[in-house]
Amino acid sequence: MQGPLYIGFDLSTQQLKGLVVNSDLKVVYVSKFDFDADSHGFPIKKGVLTNEAEHEVFAPVALWLQALDGVLEGLRKQGMDFSQIKGISGAGQQHGSVYWGENAEKLLKELDASKTLEEQLDGAFSHPFSPNWQDSSTQKECDEFDAALGGQSELAFATGSKAHHRFTGPQIMRFQRKYPDVYKKTSRISLVSSFIASLFLGHIAPMDISDVCGMNLWNIKKGAYDEKLLQLCAGSSGVDDLKRKLGDVPEDGGIHLGPIDRYYVERYGFSPDCTIIPATGDNPATILALPLRASDAMVSLGTSTTFLMSTPSYKPDPATHFFNHPTTAGLYMFMLCYKNGGLARELVRDAVNEKLGEKPSTSWANFDKVTLETPPMGQKADSDPMKLGLFFPRPEIVPNLRSGQWRFDYNPKDGSLQPSNGGWDEPFDEARAIVESQMLSLRLRSRGLTQSPGEGIPAQPRRVYLVGGGSKNKAIAKVAGEILGGSEGVYKLEIGDNACALGAAYKAVWAMERAEGQTFEDLIGKRWHEEEFIEKIADGYQPGVFERYGQAAEGFEKMELEVLRQEGKH
């Protein structure tokens, strides 16, 4: 007899994954459905359809129904006993919206266990497509959202972010303008996360307290939809109608939404007591893939760079994102997204290899050696200026700049900043400088969100977790620790591409097994086998070095402002 099991679903752009864990957080089954490889009847590419003329990127909702049929069938083939599943949660690609038709509730309630979901729910939607996060068709709407409360800073303060093309509010606004009749016939609007929960509940599920913050509609401090923004978004159909479409949002991320629909009991043998828990967004689910304590930081070093932190401080800014924490009241999730990450580092790596001319043992060996041999900020002596630079092979959003490279010399003693005048030994000085540049930007933008981890230690993260391709690189890890700190060190987190599904499954475990008032971090922290998932790869806080990089961060901020001024952006 196996103990209780929990499923976390991850509905991303290119696949649906169902990951099953037991109470001890051990993964016991995984079933995947790759949209391009496994689906039939949809002319998709990389999971989406595009209308380039209008910059639209979207997915057919029926594809996701086919995928859920496929994932559950996959678990059945692996011999999983569905009657052991006690709780289900999920993670959905953030910001995407699903438009339900007037007969949606009826169709969800009357599912026939002898047929697939796709056969029966194809007609449940007023609009067959869901906008994808890559969609950029809403510039006009974003401009209106940014202006609605007085400016980008005001919108960010209210909703956690300035307006973004992919955010659900601007998308709904464009939808009601482009398809006014379809909008009127839309009974409910779900996020991708609450869509997953709705399928299992057999009726429309409420949105999740964290994922609702990715809409530009939820006033985070008030804990309610922002009336002015609803008014802007709703157009002539009015605020009350839009409120009905969106529904109420429960405060508790672990609330029991209700039992699984009888369709799944009859078709797969789920227990009628299996409980559905609110599904959250893919980014909030990522911080649930480990017991991330307040002030811990997670840096994803992939093609782009993403920085996630759990913090009690709410200090929004147009360049960053704040969300309610998906499980823990009083905490927020802070997020930074950069377009330039791995590619920028690889270009410097290639230049170093070319200059040296010899074939290194691994492609990163020379880059690492040069990075570690170069002193912090290229200062061989205290009297030397700090070498600071920006390296953007792609246009950047943080700060908002064109692609390009800029190099400066900064003197922390008098605060003077000069464009570099041939003092750089290119490309060797750039190896360390590019890692410093990326990490200083993270430090600059997360200051004020951390606390002191102990007597006499400056405010910084307790731990810095690195994930993604760049986390394998010891030199990057060492520089990350010197700049970001981390009183307990820098760790490599090995959860592969399962982070979102794991986070969703852990959320279900916590929601079903928590004691009264027990936090997610406490319950998961006691059961998480950290030695299986993390390895300490570098020291964090080093007295003296950390403070020196604090001076560099001031120079870095001056440099960004100077470049923005030069480019006519400030």
UniProtKB/Swiss-Prot annotation:
Source organism's superkingdom? Eukaryota
Where is it found, in Gene Ontology cellular component terms?
A: cytosol
User: Which sites bind substrate?
Assistant: H95, R166, D282, N283
Q: Which GO terms describe its biological process?
A: D-xylose metabolic process; xylulose metabolic process
Recorded protein name is Probable D-xylulose kinase A
Name the Enzyme Commission number(s) assigned to this protein. Answer: 2.7.1.17
Gene encoding this polypeptide? Answer: xkiA
- Keywords in UniProt for this one? ATP-binding, Carbohydrate metabolism, Cytoplasm, Kinase, Nucleotide-binding, Transferase, Xylose metabolism
Q: Which family does the record assign?
A: Belongs to the FGGY kinase family.
**Any GO MF annotation of the entry:** D-xylulokinase activity
What EC class does the entry list?
transferase
Cell location:
Cytoplasm
The cross-references to Pfam families, in alphabetical order and at most eight, read: FGGY_C, FGGY_N
Q: Which reaction does it catalyse?
A: D-xylulose + ATP = D-xylulose 5-phosphate + ADP + H(+)
- Inducing factors: By D-xylose, L-arabinose or L-arabitol.
Record's function text: Highly specific D-xylulose kinase which participates in the catabolism of xylose. Xylose is a major component of hemicelluloses such as xylan. Most fungi utilize D-xylose via three enzymatic reactions, xylose reductase (XR), xylitol dehydrogenase (XDH), and xylulokinase, to form xylulose 5-phosphate, which enters pentose phosphate pathway.
